[in-house]
C-alpha cells in the first residue's frame, strides 16, 4: 500500500441547490485570503476546513488528504484528491450527512500496489474495467467491451476475461517497440460496499 493515493470523488445530487452549496464550500475554502497568503496552500485544500465549513468538528474524524481540483459536470461535483493510505470515508460521510440528497461515489487508484477500489457497484460513475496509459484512460462497463478494445489494439481476437486481456497486452508489448507513454495497462475496480 502506498503512502499517498489518488481518489476521485463524484458527488451526485438530485437537488441542485444542495450541490451548489457543496460547491460553494469548496470555492470558499479555495479562495480564503488567509490560506492564499500561505505558500503551502496555493494548489490544494485540506479536507479539515471543508468538513468544518459543513458544520462538523474535524478533530472527530480521520481526515488525511487534500483536494487538488474540483469542478461541476452537470449534476455532479467531481473532486480530485490525494489522500493518506486509503479513501477517506469520514470525508465522504460528512458530505452525505450534511446533504442527504447527495450520494458520494469514489474511485481509489493506487497503481504502486495495483489496487483499485470503488463504491459504485453499478459502474455508473466508475466503470469496473479500464485501460490506462500515460495520458489516456478508457473505461468499460463490461469485460466484453474491454476485450474488444484490446482486440483492436493488438490486431487479433482477445477472449473476454481479465487473464486473456493481461496476456494479450503482455504478448503485444513484448513483440512490438512501443514507447512507455503509449503502453496501456488493464485495470479493474474492486467494489467495496460500506
Predicted region positions:
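Pyridoxal 5′-phosphate
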Residues: 34-41
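Short, extreme N-terminal segment that most often corresponds to the first beta-strand
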Residues: 1-33, 192-194
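A contiguous, well-structured "functional interface" segment within a domain
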Residues: 11-18, 38, 49-56
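Charged interaction segments
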Residues: 48-194
Amino acid at each position: 500500500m502506498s503512502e499517498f493515493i489518488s481518489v476521485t470523488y463524484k458527488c451526485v445530487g438530485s437537488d441542485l441547490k444542495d450541490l451548489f452549496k457543496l460547491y460553494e464550500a469548496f470555492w470558499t475554502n479555495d479562495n480564503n485570503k488567509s490560506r492564499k497568503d500561505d505558500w503551502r496552500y496555493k494548489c490544494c485544500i485540506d479536507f479539515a476546513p471543508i468538513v468544518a465549513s459543513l458544520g462538523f468538528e474535524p478533530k472527530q474524524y480521520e481526515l488525511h488528504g487534500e483536494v487538488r481540483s474540483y469542478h461541476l459536470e452537470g449534476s455532479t461535483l467531481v473532486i480530485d484528491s490525494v489522500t493518506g493510505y486509503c479513501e477517506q470515508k469520514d470525508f465522504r460521510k460528512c458530505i452525505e450527512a450534511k446533504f442527504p440528497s447527495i450520494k458520494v461515489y469514489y474511485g481509489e487508484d493506487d497503481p504502486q500496489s495495483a489496487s483499485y477500489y470503488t463504491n459504485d457497484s453499478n459502474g455508473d460513475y466508475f466503470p469496473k474495467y479500464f485501460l490506462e496509459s500515460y495520458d489516456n484512460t478508457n473505461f468499460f462497463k463490461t469485460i466484453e467491451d474491454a476485450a474488444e478494445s484490446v482486440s483492436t489494439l493488438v490486431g487479433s481476437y482477445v477472449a473476454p476475461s481479465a487473464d486473456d486481456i493481461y496476456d494479450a497486452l503482455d504478448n503485444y508489448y513484448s513483440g512490438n517497440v512501443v514507447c512507455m507513454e503509449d503502453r496501456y495497462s488493464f485495470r479493474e475496480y474492486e467494489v467495496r460496499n460500506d
